[in-house]
């Protein structure tokens, strides 16, 4: 994994080169004079061309860290699924500030335990009826997974379907059930043969409930991504027990045109395929408690090595159009002296103590340096270059502790 302090360098230098006027949140007080001097020296046309090339290089470095081929340019029609926002809040600990009614899902511990990347996909709008052995309607829909990188190993996948209750006067109806079956299309329908499908998951659910249902479709998606088998889509079949044919399939929301209420909510209620994968870099997603600020006791000499505040605001560098959350984060940085003799609170190594001792008698040997000794990860929710929503864990992004090394 590329060290987190490299990303901080990229962000800081991009801010300088962009020539923004508001550095309050991004540049610490002690660094503003140097930034102003750099900007003052940047008046020539030659500097403008050089800074443009540097900016492109820095942005390329950042995009490589994110695993992106190019800078995302989100379309106005891009939709952020509520599920992904809730998953981000649960994963980052923000649900502690929200009521249980606002976040109505449980964190998928099992799926996330082997993944550092979560991706969401909406199905393509074109739907197709697929004949089956029963009279229950079977609808085929396709998810385009071509944006999943080759180096990302998919470990589990879930299909989320929204179903609404259908009001009926019969008491027997309210006590009834219906079954939802999910199939993988192994061979599509053709003029010469019927479609061949295999059952992936099934669920018996109560009629009189409105909620999201989750189905395990891992075998199909792993075949498509890892084994490079053809993706012919999925089929949904809804069978209502002891129900008239006119009501078959009315519960599950898979099409914009279905005669259901809340038509304007289609963007949030349409089927959603969620993949959990790992790109081989960093640790898996883990549900974290909300990070509380560390309070360091007052030190006699504030010039010594310690942690300083550094808030990275993505809007300052123009990346807030594709980074959904967080809007920024407290990255911190390490700065200060490592004087002889090194005190215990400076978190030094034996080598740093020896180096500082030698420096006290031979100034040609440099002092120990104030550097991060503990770094933590952050989670980011963003739109990639294909307008797909991604939740990813990035290591070594926040300084938790400093020391002389």
UniProtKB/Swiss-Prot annotation:
Disulfide bond residue pairs: 305-370, 334-402, 338-404
Gene3D superfamilies the UniProt entry points to: 2.60.120.970, Cystine-knot cytokines
Glycosylation sites: 144, 208, 347, 362
SMART domains xref list: TGFB
Source organism superkingdom: Eukaryota
GO terms classed as biological process: beak formation; beak morphogenesis; cartilage development; embryonic skeletal system morphogenesis; intermediate mesodermal cell differentiation; negative regulation of DNA-templated transcription; nephric duct formation; ossification
Localisation: Secreted
Keywords: Chondrogenesis, Cleavage on pair of basic residues, Cytokine, Developmental protein, Differentiation, Disulfide bond, Glycoprotein, Growth factor, Osteogenesis, Secreted, Signal
GO CC annotation terms, alphabetical: extracellular space
Propeptide boundaries: 20-291
InterPro entries per UniProt: BMP4_TGF_beta-like (IPR047833), Cystine-knot_cytokine (IPR029034), TGF-b_C (IPR001839), TGF-b_propeptide (IPR001111), TGF-beta-rel (IPR015615), TGFb_CS (IPR017948)
Signal sequence segment: 1-19
One annotated GO molecular function: growth factor activity
Pfam families attached to this UniProt entry: TGF_beta, TGFb_propeptide
Record's function text: Negatively regulates the structure and function of the limb apical ectodermal ridge.
Family: Belongs to the TGF-beta family.
Assembly behavior: Homodimer; disulfide-linked. Part of a complex consisting of TWSG1 and CHRD. Forms a ternary complex with chordin/CHRD and TSKU.
Full protein name: Bone morphogenetic protein 4
């Amino acid at each position: 994994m590329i060290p987190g302090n490299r990303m901080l360098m990229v962000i800081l230098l991009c801010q300088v080169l962009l020539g923004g006027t508001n550095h309050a949140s991004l540049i610490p007080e002690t660094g503003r004079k140097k930034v102003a001097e750099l900007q003052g020296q940047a008046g020539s046309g030659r500097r403008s061309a050089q800074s443009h090339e540097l900016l492109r290089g820095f942005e390329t470095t950042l995009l490589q860290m994110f695993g992106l081929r190019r800078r995302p340019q989100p379309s106005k029609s891009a939709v952020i699924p509520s599920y992904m926002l809730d998953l981000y809040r649960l994963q980052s600990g923000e649900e502690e500030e929200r009521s249980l009614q606002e976040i109505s899902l449980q964190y998928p511990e099992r799926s996330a335990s082997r993944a550092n990347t979560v991706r969401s996909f909406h199905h393509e709008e074109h739907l197709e009826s697929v004949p089956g052995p029963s009279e229950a309607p079977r609808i085929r829909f396709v998810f385009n997974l071509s944006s999943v990188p080759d180096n990302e190993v998919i470990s589990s996948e879930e299909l989320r379907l929204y179903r609404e209750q259908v009001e009926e006067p019969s008491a027997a109806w309210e006590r009834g059930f219906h079954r939802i079956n999910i199939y993988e299309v192994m061979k599509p329908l053709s003029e010469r043969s019927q479609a061949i499908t295999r059952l992936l998951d099934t669920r018996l659910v109560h009629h009189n409930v409105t909620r999201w249902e989750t189905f395990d479709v891992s075998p199909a998606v792993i075949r498509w991504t890892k084994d490079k088998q053809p993706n012919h889509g999925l089929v949904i079949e809804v069978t209502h027990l002891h129900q008239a044919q006119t009501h078959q399939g009315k519960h599950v929301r898979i099409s914009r045109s279905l005669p259901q209420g809340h038509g304007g909510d289609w963007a949030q209620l349409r089927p959603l395929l969620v993949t959990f994968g790992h790109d081989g870099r960093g640790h898996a997603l883990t549900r974290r408690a909300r990070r509380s600020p560390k309070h360091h006791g007052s030190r006699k000499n504030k010039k010594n090595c310690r942690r300083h505040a550094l808030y990275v605001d993505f809007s300052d560098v123009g990346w807030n159009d594709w980074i959904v959350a967080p809007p920024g984060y407290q990255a911190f940085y390490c700065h200060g002296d490592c004087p002889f003799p090194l005190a215990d609170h400076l978190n030094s190594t034996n080598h740093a103590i020896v180096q500082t001792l030698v420096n006290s008698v031979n100034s040609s040997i440099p002092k120990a340096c104030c550097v991060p000794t503990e770094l933590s990860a952050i989670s980011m929710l963003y739109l990639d270059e294909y307008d797909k929503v991604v939740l990813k864990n990035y290591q070594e992004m926040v300084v938790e502790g400093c020391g002389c090394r």
